[in-house]
Structure formats: structure tokens, C-alpha cells
A protein has these predicted regions:
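Non-catalytic terminal/interface segments that mediate subunit docking, oligomerization
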Residues: 75-113
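Conserved small/polar residues in nucleotide/adenosyl-binding loops
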Residues: 114-120
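Extended, charge-enriched "interface" segments that sit outside catalytic cores
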Residues: 1-69, 75
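Intrinsically disordered, low-complexity regions enriched for glutamine and histidine
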Residues: 10, 120-121
């Protein structure tokens, strides 16, 4: 069975060595506490979700695809997508950069955007 290994080291290199994102975040009072460990934790957990939940859906996505009921105009996603999306939302991935007052995690967009480069984009 195929597997997916997220390029975490590459992503960490870009965030920390190329962009030096934590230096810029220190200039923003609301994100001054976002450090390299926090960024790495988000990348690692996002990578787990991508490889363990999202990536395996490629098979059902390719084999089943979406179906359209022409009478009701409803689209049905392939097997597993609804459950994976529920896990995506339950895990807080959809609200990483949203205001905590509204259920978000308050992370800077630069950090929350990184998970979109992983196969989780299949679920959004």
C-alpha cells in the first residue's frame, strides 16, 4: 500500500532558516509567544493527519470519485471523506488562525497555512 511521508524537515527549514518567521512574529504582540517549538508541533501533527487520515483517501477518491444526484442536485463524496472532514474540523485544523474568542486557536496565518500544503487540502 502506498504511503505518504510529509516533508517536515523541508517545511521547518523554510519556516525557520529561510523565512525566519519567529523573528517577524516577535514584532506582532498577538503572536510574540509563537515559537519554533509551537510551529514544529503544528507541522508534526498536521503531518500525522495528512499521512494517517487524508492520504489514504486518495484511493477511494480516485476509484469512487464524487457522485451527483441530478434529481436532488446533491453531491456525495467518496467513502471516508465525510468522516475525515469531521476529524479535520474536530482537530481544530479549520480554525488554526481564527480568533480564540470564536473557537479558533489564534495562530498566525503563516503557521496555519502550512497545513494546507499537506494532503489535508483534499478535505477542504
Amino acid at each position: 500500500m502506498p504511503s505518504y511521508t510529509p516533508p517536515l524537515r523541508d517545511m521547518q527549514f523554510v519556516m525557520h532558516e529561510v523565512l525566519k518567521v519567529t523573528d517577524d512574529l516577535k514584532l506582532c504582540p498577538q503572536h510574540a509567544d509563537t515559537d519554533a517549538d509551537t510551529i514544529n508541533a503544528v507541522l508534526e501533527e498536521g503531518g500525522k493527519f495528512a499521512s494517517e487520515v487524508a492520504f489514504p483517501l486518495n484511493i477511494s477518491g480516485d476509484e469512487e470519485g464524487c457522485t451527483l444526484d441530478k434529481t436532488t442536485h446533491e453531491v456525495t463524496a467518496p467513502k471516508g471523506f465525510k468522516e475525515a472532514y469531521a476529524q479535520y474540523v474536530q482537530g481544530g485544523w479549520a480554525a488554526l488562525s481564527c480568533d480564540p474568542a470564536y473557537g479558533g486557536q489564534g495562530l498566525p496565518f503563516a503557521v496555519s497555512y502550512t497545513h494546507l500544503t499537506l494532503p489535508t487540502i483534499l478535505l477542504v
